[in-house]
């Protein structure tokens, strides 16, 4: 319960203010977490409004089931299933989609979940521990090349190859040492390889991020849900996305820019600008946490929120 109480929703008021444009609309919270955004959205909706939330984490589902509001429903699945899940409920268009990306404080702070290098625990890292392959299972079979690519591409770690070599060497000792199945040992292996220190960062930060992203297919799911949100939004509907690292933010930024720009046409062709299809999105802007919020919640420091609005039906 203590971890539940420690969780602070980032950019709470700003996100809900940007998202909810009509109190009778249908809204989607793609990442329920511990319900901060969902509760705030419900507080702004009228009797006819609806909110459908998604989460992969069974503990988030337990929390959501305690809300007890007829306007609210929860889906135990990735937000990548949004299009199909809403279609199954007869919903074709929504007034807004909110995505609060990344891992939540209760997940990080619970050593049993395997997300943190600060306390020893089982090497799991799955948002939903009942589905898919754990971090330990993946590390036990991944090739040197796959390890290198994941740590380099998802962790932006310049020592990716050296870390991957150390992990393969550790795996070769499994008969003598047992499997690599604890966060503490993984952090120790990375710490022995990464000798340089980034200010305020543990040497294992990038590797843990990379493995977590891979195990949970976070970036692939993000691309799927952005495409789904674009097709689901009604005219005037809002897409609000909060990201916490550059990989996520880059995908969101490029997606919004790509769909807020008129199609490129060879100037030699006899086509007038008014004859071109209008871009489907308008970029509203981006926001960062205030100094006061960062002081109260240091984990908010890296957050950036991007907002776009659907222009066309």
Curated annotation (Swiss-Prot):
GO molecular function, one term: rRNA (cytosine-N4-)-methyltransferase activity
Reaction(s) the record says it catalyses: cytidine(1402) in 16S rRNA + S-adenosyl-L-methionine = N(4)-methylcytidine(1402) in 16S rRNA + S-adenosyl-L-homocysteine + H(+)
Keyword Nucleotide-binding: no
Main location: cytoplasm
Assigned EC number: 2.1.1.199
Classification via SUPFAM superfamilies: Putative methyltransferase TM0872, insert domain, S-adenosyl-L-methionine-dependent methyltransferases
Compartmental location: Cytoplasm
Gene Ontology terms: cellular component: cytoplasm
Positions bound to S-adenosyl-L-methionine: 35-37, 55, 79, 100, 107
One Pfam family hit: Methyltransf_5
Top-level lineage group: Bacteria
Keyword list, A-Z: Cytoplasm, Methyltransferase, rRNA processing, S-adenosyl-L-methionine, Transferase
Any GO BP: rRNA base methylation
Family statement drawn from the similarity comment of this UniProt entry: Belongs to the methyltransferase superfamily. RsmH family.
Function description: Specifically methylates the N4 position of cytidine in position 1402 (C1402) of 16S rRNA.
Record-given protein name: Ribosomal RNA small subunit methyltransferase H
Protein species of origin: Burkholderia multivorans (strain ATCC 17616 / 249)
């Amino acid at each position: 319960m203590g971890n539940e109480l420690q969780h602070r929703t980032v950019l709470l008021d700003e996100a809900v203010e940007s998202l909810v444009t009509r109190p009778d609309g249908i809204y989607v919270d793609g990442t329920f977490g511990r319900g901060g955004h969902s509760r705030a959205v419900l507080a702004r909706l009228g009797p006819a409004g609806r909110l459908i939330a998604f989460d992969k984490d069974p503990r988030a589902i337990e929390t959501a089931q305690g809300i007890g509001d007829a306007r609210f429903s929860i889906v135990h699945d990735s937000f990548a299933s949004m299009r199909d899940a809403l279609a199954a409920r007869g919903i074709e268009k929504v007034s807004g989609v909110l995505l609060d990306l990344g891992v939540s404080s209760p997940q990080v702070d619970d050593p049993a979940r395997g997300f943190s290098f600060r306390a020893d625990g089982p090497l799991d890292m799955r948002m939903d521990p009942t589905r898919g392959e754990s971090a330990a299972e993946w590390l036990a079979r991944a090739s040197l090349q796959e390890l290198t690519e994941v740590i380099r591409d998802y962790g932006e770690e310049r020592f990716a190859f050296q870390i991957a070599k150390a992990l393969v060497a550790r795996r070769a000792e499994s008969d003598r040492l047992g499997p690599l199945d604890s966060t503490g040992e993984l952090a120790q292996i990375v710490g022995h390889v990464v000798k340089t220190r980034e200010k305020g960062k543990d040497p294992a930060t990038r590797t843990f991020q990379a493995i977590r992203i891979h195990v949970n297919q976070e970036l692939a799911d993000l691309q799927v849900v952005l495409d789904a949100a674009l097709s689901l939004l009604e005219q005037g509907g809002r897409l609000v996305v909060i990201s916490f690292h550059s990989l996520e933010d880059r995908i969101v930024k490029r997606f919004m820019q790509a769909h807020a720009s008129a199609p490129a046409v060879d100037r030699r062709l006899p086509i007038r600008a008014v004859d071109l299809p209008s871009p489907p999105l308008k970029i509203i802007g981006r926001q960062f946490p205030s100094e006061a919020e960062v002081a109260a919640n240091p984990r908010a420091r890296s957050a950036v929120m991007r907002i776009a609005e659907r222009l066309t039906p």
